[in-house]
Amino acid sequence: MASHSSVSYRSVRTGGTSAMIGSSGYGGSSSSRAMGLGMGAAGLSMGGGSFRVGSAGIGGMGISSGIGGMGISSRAGGMSAYGGAASGGAGGFVSGGVPMLGYGGGAGGFIGGVSPGIMASPAFTAGRAITSAGMSGVVGTLGPAGGMVPSLVSRDEVKNILGTLNQRLASYVDKVRQLTIENETMEEELKNLTGGVPMSPDSTVNLENVETQVTEMLTEVSNLTLERVRLEIDVDHLRATADEIKSKYEFELGVRMQLETDIANMKRDLEAANDMRVDLDSKFNFLTEELTFQRKTQMEELNTLKQQFGRLGPVQTSVIELDNVKSVNLTDALNVMREEYQQVVTKNVQEAETYCKMQIDQIQGISTQTTEQISILDKEINTLEKELQPLNVEYQRLLTTYQTLGDRLTDLQNRESIDLVQFQNTYTRYEQEIEGNQVDLQRQLVTYQQLLDVKTALDAEIATYKKLLEGQELMVRTAMADDFAHATVVRSGTLGGASSSSVGYGASSTTLGAISGGYSTGGGASYSAGAGGASYSAGAGGASYGVGGGYSGGSSAMMEGSSSGGHSMYSSSSMKRSSSKSASASAGGYGTSGHDSTIILQQ
């Protein structure tokens, strides 16, 4: 019966994460009654690690005596195997509440069992023993296995697992799409900031010189800030001095205004005193003239009376004699009248003179007081004028100082404005230079990171090829051990993904299976080989697991994946043993950063 082998992969490129879904083929057999059937599984890889869900198959029916292959009778049910590996020593996977072991590197992975009541094959026992050793090396001689294994996982559980993985994959894809959109937005913003300048390295820019320039600029900015503070302090001092001088000027101006007011009042008093003096002088002159006129009038009247009485006396002399006892002496009467009149005139003259003297003395006293007051006022005016002269000089000096300080303050303000504009321009220019230097530095960092990624990818690819060559040598050495009934496997663990090996056991008593070996790194290369009648292949570090069926012989598969080199390569080569047909194989890929995976399968 012809063997059939098919492997299908779907690669999803999602901006730095690659996910693969693999399915197993149909197992072959060496007789017409043996057939293997593989069920599709899924594989997922993301970031720097890997996670695989290997193929699940239902083995064919063996015709051997119960030792080889699946160790069951001709009518026994098949088996299923689930394998996987998580790079970096991740934990196992639990499906349907049943913990599964695996062949993978590190402590991760899982493997399912066969259906209840089926004896585990030596290859399965060896794979489980190797897996349980974790990252440690295993040295041992394998023999027939015994004991029971966990029950077969049902189709519903497989569907649930695949549904869960598909949901996780969809969530990862959505997240990656969102991150892609955000990345495009950030690229647009960066393009707007850089003005469309490509992020290419600038060999002419020296970061040390840039840092030195930035330090010098910051120092200059600090010095300018200190200078500005000093100028502000000087301006404040000048303003305080100007305010003090202004207050003094206002005080002196108030004193001057008060003095001018007092002088004006004194001038008004002096004018009033002068007017009073003139009035009193005029009154004095009027009274003097009136006194003179009264004297003159009285003298004229007196002279007239004297003339009258004197003319009558000598001219008319008559003696009248009366014969009366009571005769009247007219001369005596006239003399008496004259004396009385003279007394009255004298009294009036004296009263008039006394009154005039009193008025004159009063006027003279008032005039003297006024004169004294005028003299005092003149002295005070002279004193105030003398005091006002230095005040005027001080006022002129303060006014000149105020104008000078005002001009200086204006000059300082203009200079400060000019310096501030220059400082702002310098600061803006320095900020632009710093931003440009930051953009150049970011561009150089991006270029450096790209080169570092390329270097890491190349190193990982070189390491992968080295391990591939080591795996091929191991396959050649193990192929020479087909005449032995038992196989000894020695592998040592390595960091990041460790190494693992599995063996296959013969399908019959006359034909032994070839030893299958595996090797894994932390998400890097992996090799798996399956051999024997109804053996399973074991993989590590993200490899796959297949189930084969047949009478004798088998095939070996070699698979390798690289996680950091920018691509993944999977290859499979078969080694025919005896008259066997090739068994099925499936592989789960390991993702790379933004690149699709390439699958190569050879029979």
From Swiss-Prot:
Residues 511-603 are annotated as: Tail. Residues 382-389 are annotated as: Linker 2. This is Thread biopolymer filament subunit gamma. Residues 342-362 are annotated as: Linker 12. PANTHER family: INTERMEDIATE FILAMENT, KERATIN, TYPE I CYTOSKELETAL 47 KDA. It is found in: Secreted, Extracellular space. Residues 228-240 are annotated as: Linker 1.
